[in-house]
A protein has these predicted regions:
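Extracellular/luminal Protease-associated
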Residues: 1-38, 43-47
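Structural motif
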Residues: 19-22, 42-45, 83-85, 106-107, ...
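Short, ordered loop/turn segments at secondary-structure junctions
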Residues: 25-28, 48-52, 113-114, 121
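Short, structured interface segments
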Residues: 47-65
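P-loop NTPase nucleotide-binding/switch module
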Residues: 61-81
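Glycine-rich phosphate-binding P-loop
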Residues: 81-109
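Conserved nucleotide-sensing/catalytic segment adjacent to the nucleotide-binding pocket
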Residues: 110-166
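Conserved NTP phosphate-binding and transfer environment spanning the P-loop NTPase/kinase superfamily
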Residues: 161-240
Length: 240
């Protein structure tokens, strides 16, 4: 290319409103290109990645960094591969339940504060950096879950699939016993299925959460609910 033609095209290129320039494949930009970029105060970045890989990685990175986010009070655990957000008033037993779940082989994401980002319709929960791997248990204090139960007991992030809200048991409350009530919690515009768990002495809440996780997984694989099974059995008996 002739020198005058090249200079003219480079100047025209930089006449547009450009935030920055990224050169991939480790290519070396022409000195005239750099000179014109300095004149217009435009950043020129380089990467050894091929263009398609760079675009893919950059898109994922920006989707995470620019995603809408919020922080909720609660505990996030990974139970049988299902991300469960445990909510409820302070002192009701969220952290103690999480500790029991960890002892049973499940994993902690975060305790007390849950940072949540909405990425492409998914809710991704993580822990604030200062409390990663930490669990606060009343009467004991703060414990390092990683040190006590190993690296596999903590996971960095998890998609929230289910919300389990703890509340004190009330005899005058008609709690759902058939699993037919549909409750949802809105988080950053995404509706997440919500289960109300009444808490009182003697109830093994950790086992209940395990059952809820397995039941949720079952509901994803099957269109037939336990209520449907019971109705089918009743119809079969009535036909005899």
């Amino acid at each position: 290319m002739q020198i005058e033609v090249r200079k003219k095209r480079v100047k025209k290129y930089f006449s547009f409103d450009i935030s920055c320039l990224i050169i991939t494949r480790g290519l070396e930009p022409h000195p005239e290109f750099i000179s014109e970029a300095k004149k217009h105060k435009i950043w020129v970045l380089r990467s050894k990645l091929v263009t398609t890989n760079f675009i893919s990685k950059t898109t994922i990175y920006l989707s995470d960094k620019l995603a809408p986010e919020t922080r909720l009070h609660g505990v996030l655990v990974d139970v049988s591969g299902i991300g469960i957000l445990i909510t409820g008033e302070s002192g009701i037993g969220k952290s103690e339940t999480a500790l029991e779940l960890i002892k049973r082989g499940h994993r902690l994401v975060t305790d007390d504060a849950v940072d949540i980002k909405e990425i492409d319709g998914d809710l991704i929960g993580t822990s604030p950096k200062i409390t990663v791997g930490m669990l606060e248990v009343r009467g004991i204090g703060i414990i390092d879950v990683t040190q006590l139960y190993g690296l596999s007991s903590v996971v960095q992030k998890k998609e929230i699939k289910l919300v389990m809200h703890f509340e004190h048991w009330r005899d005058d409350n008609d709690y759902d016993r058939l699993g037919i009530d549909e409750n949802y919690m809105d988080i950053l515009g995404v509706k997440v299925k919500k289960l109300i768990v009444p808490v009182r002495p003697g109830r093994n809440i950790a086992v209940i959460i395990e059952a809820a996780a397995v039941n949720y997984r079952y509901s994803l694989m099957s269109q037939i609910t336990p209520v449907d099974v019971i109705e089918n059995r009743m119809n079969t008996i009535s036909d005899l």
